[in-house]
C-alpha cells in the first residue's frame, strides 16, 4: 500500500558540485573545478586522459577520496559525461575502491564509491536528471545569469578566461541547485529525490496525497502493463507548401495534456468483476476488428513499433480508448478474453491545481524558476507509477559475499577489472501501472479526438500535438488546444519519419538568423547542432555521421571518448504506407 509521507524530517541536505573541461575530442581533461557554496578549488594539468595519474581528473579524485564526505557530488549532465571520466579514472587508478552504478538507460543515474579498507563513501549524481535543461537556460531561469559568453571552445584550454569559465559553471550550478532545493521545500512542499520522477513522487506523497493507494493483484498488474502504451508519433503526409488556398500549416498543441489527464478520476481499487464491461474503468484483453478508415485510433505493438492500424488483432486496451473506437464506428470486438476493472478516485487534482497555479503568469507572485519547477513536477509524476520491477545495478570490484548472495553475473572487461551486473525483481508500493497506463490512454484519446476532427488534413502528430491545415478550437485551459506557431506560421514542412522533420516559418526566430526548425532525433553529433540539410540528406537515403560519448558499459569494455558511426533513416517498414504523392494510409495487420 502506498501511504502518504509525514514530511517530518524534511530538510535541505548539503551538497557539492564539480565540473570538468576537456579538449574538443572529448578524450582529454585539463581542468576540474569544485565548489561547496563557501570554497572553490580547481585542478589543472596538460590535456590528459582521465586514467593518467597526473591528469586534472585524477588530481581531483585523489583529493576527494582523501576527504570523506556525506555530501553528494553533482555535475550537470554528469551521468553522460563528467561521471564517465571519473569512472574511467577510478577503474584504472584506484584498485581498492568498489563502485556501484545505478543506470538509467545508458546514463549513470547514481554512482556510489566506497573504500574497501576505511569504508568511506562518496556519491556522484547528475543534476540534469533532476532539472532536465541546459545549465545556461537554468542559470537564466533561476538566477538571471548564464555561463561566460563569447568563448571559443576549441581553444578554451589556451584561453586565460578558462578559469573564469570553469568557476562560473561551478558557482552557477551550485546557486541553481541551492535555489531549487529551497523552492522545492518551502514553496512546493516537496522532497528531493535523485531524479525528476522520484522528486515528483516524494513531493506528491509528502504534501498532496490524501489517502493510501492499495496494491493490485498480479493479474491486474499484468493486464495494466500490457495496456500501457506510449504516445502516438507519426507522419500522415510528407510535404506541405503554402499556396493561395492554404497559406499556413498549424501546429496545435494540447495545453499540459498529461496534467489534464491526471485531473480525471484514476483507477485505484481493483473490482471483483469479470466479463466484458467497456463502460467501466479498466483494461480489456480482446480480439478486435478495425475497419478501413484513414485515422484508426487503437494502438498495436508489432515489430518493435507502436502502430495504429486497421485489420484484426488481439491486444489489451484501455476502456476509454475502446469506447472511443467503437463510438466512432471504427472497431468491433470479436472476442473477449479477460479483463480487470477498478474503482476510481480523484487523487491528483489537488497536486495539479496547486502546481499549475505556479505557472499562471497573471499571478502577481509568478516566478520563472518555480514555474519551470512546477512544469517538471507536473510532467514527471505519472510515469513513476509504471516503473519496471526488474532493475539492473553495475558493480565494480564487489565483495565475494555480495557476488554470491546477489547472484551477480560477470560482465566481460578486457581491462582485467572485476565487473558484474546484478538483476533484481523488486516490487515497490508505488508501482501501480494502471495509473500510468490510464493517464497515457486519456492523453491518446485527447489526441485522437483532434485527429478525427481534422481527418486527412493531418500531416503529423507527436504525443500531444497535431500539424494540420484545418482549424481546431483553442483555449487557455488545461487540455484545450493552442496554436503553437500562431505568431510565426509554418509555410513549408517536410515530415520524413517520427521525430525527423523540417519546418520553415514566415519569420526568423528571436535572437536567430534562421526561420528553420530542423529536427532529427538520434542523428546529431555529441554536443553539436544538426547540419542544416540533415533531413534532406536522410530523405535522399544518405547516412549521417553521428557521434556519442562513451557510456559506463563502454568504459568497462575498454572504450572511452567520442565514438563515430554512420546512421541512416530506415524507411523499409514505416508506421503507415506512403504513396508517391506523399499521402498515406494505415497498415493492415492480422494476428491473434
Language-model features: where?
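Polybasic, low-complexity terminal segments and linkers that are predominantly intrinsically disordered
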Residues: 1-6
Amino acid at each position: 500500500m502506498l501511504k502518504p509521507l509525514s514530511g517530518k524530517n524534511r530538510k535541505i541536505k548539503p551538497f557539492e558540485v564539480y565540473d570538468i573541461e576537456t579538449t574538443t575530442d572529448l578524450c582529454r581533461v585539463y581542468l576540474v573545478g569544485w565548489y561547496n557554496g563557501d570554497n572553490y578549488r580547481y585542478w589543472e594539468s596538460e590535456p590528459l586522459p582521465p586514467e593518467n595519474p597526473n591528469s586534472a581528473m585524477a588530481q581531483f579524485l585523489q583529493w576527494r577520496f582523501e576527504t570523506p564526505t556525506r555530501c553528494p557530488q553533482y555535475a550537470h549532465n554528469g551521468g553522460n559525461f563528467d561521471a564517465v571520466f571519473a569512472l574511467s579514472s577510478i577503474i584504472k587508478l584506484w584498485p581498492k575502491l568498489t563502485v556501484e552504478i545505478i543506470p538509467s538507460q545508458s546514463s549513470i543515474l547514481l554512482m556510489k564509491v566506497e573504500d574497501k579498507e576505511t569504508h568511506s563513501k562518496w556519491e556522484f549524481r547528475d543534476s540534469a536528471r533532476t532539472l532536465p535543461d541546459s545549465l545556461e537556460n537554468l542559470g537564466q531561469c533561476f538566477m538571471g545569469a548564464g555561463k561566460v559568453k563569447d568563448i571559443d571552445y576549441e581553444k578554451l584550454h589556451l584561453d586565460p578566461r578558462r578559469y573564469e569559465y570553469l568557476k562560473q559553471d561551478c558557482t552557477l550550478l551550485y546557486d541553481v541547485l541551492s535555489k531549487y532545493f529551497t523552492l522545492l521545500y518551502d514553496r512546493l512542499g516537496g522532497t528531493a529525490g535523485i531524479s525528476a520522477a522520484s522528486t515528483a513522487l516524494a513531493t506528491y506523497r509528502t504534501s498532496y496525497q490524501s489517502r493510501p493507494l492499495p496494491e493490485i493483484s498480479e493479474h491486474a498488474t499484468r493486464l495494466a502493463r500490457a495496456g500501457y502504451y506510449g504516445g502516438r508519433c507519426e507522419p500522415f503526409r510528407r510535404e506541405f507548401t503554402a499556396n493561395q488556398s492554404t497559406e499556413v500549416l498549424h501546429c496545435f498543441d494540447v495545453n499540459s495534456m498529461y496534467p489534464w489527464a491526471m485531473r480525471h478520476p484514476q483507477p485505484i481499487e481493483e473490482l471483483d468483476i469479470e466479463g466484458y464491461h467497456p463502460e467501466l474503468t479498466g483494461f480489456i484483453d480482446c480480439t478486435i476488428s478495425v475497419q478501413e478508415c484513414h485515422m484508426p485510433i487503437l494502438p498495436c505493438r508489432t515489430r518493435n513499433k507502436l502502430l495504429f492500424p486497421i485489420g484484426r488483432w488481439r491486444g489489451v486496451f484501455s476502456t476509454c480508448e475502446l469506447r472511443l473506437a467503437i463510438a466512432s464506428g471504427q472497431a468491433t470486438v470479436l472476442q473477449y478474453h479477460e479483463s480487470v476493472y477498478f474503482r476510481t478516485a480523484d487523487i491528483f487534482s489537488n497536486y495539479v491545481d496547486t502546481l499549475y497555479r505556479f505557472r499562471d503568469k497573471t499571478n502577481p507572485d509568478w516566478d520563472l524558476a518555480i514555474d519551470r519547477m512546477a512544469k517538471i513536477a507536473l510532467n514527471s509524476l505519472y510515469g513513476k507509477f509504471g516503473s519496471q520491477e526488474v532493475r539492473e545495478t553495475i558493480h565494480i570490484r564487489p565483495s565475494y559475499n555480495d557476488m554470491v548472495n546477489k547472484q551477480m553475473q560477470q560482465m566481460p572487461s578486457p581491462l582485467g577489472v572485476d565487473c558484474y551486473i546484478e538483476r533484481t525483481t523488486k516490487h515497490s508500493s508505488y508501482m501501480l501501472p494502471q495509473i500510468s497506463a490510464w493517464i497515457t490512454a486519456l492523453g491518446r484519446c485527447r489526441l485522437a479526438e483532434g485527429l478525427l476532427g481534422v481527418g486527412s488534413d493531418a500531416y503529423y502528430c507527436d504525443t500531444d500535438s497535431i500539424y494540420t491545415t484545418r482549424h481546431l478550437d483553442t483555449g487557455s485551459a488545461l487540455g484545450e488546444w493552442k496554436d503553437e506557431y500562431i505568431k510565426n506560421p509554418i509555410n513549408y514542412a517536410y515530415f520524413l519519419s517520427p521525430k525527423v522533420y523540417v519546418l520553415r516559418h514566415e519569420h526568423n526566430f528571436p535572437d536567430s538568423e534562421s526561420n528553420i526548425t530542423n529536427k532529427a532525433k538520434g542523428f546529431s553529433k555529441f554536443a553539436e547542432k544538426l547540419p542544416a540539410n540533415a533531413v534532406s540528406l536522410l530523405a535522399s537515403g544518405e547516412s549521417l555521421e553521428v557521434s556519442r560519448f562513451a557510456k559506463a558499459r563502454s568504459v568497462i569494455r575498454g572504450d572511452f571518448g567520442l565514438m563515430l558511426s554512420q546512421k541512416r533513416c530506415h524507411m523499409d517498414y514505416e508506421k503507415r504506407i506512403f504513396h508517391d504523392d506523399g499521402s498515406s494510409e494505415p497498415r493492415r495487420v492480422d494476428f491473434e
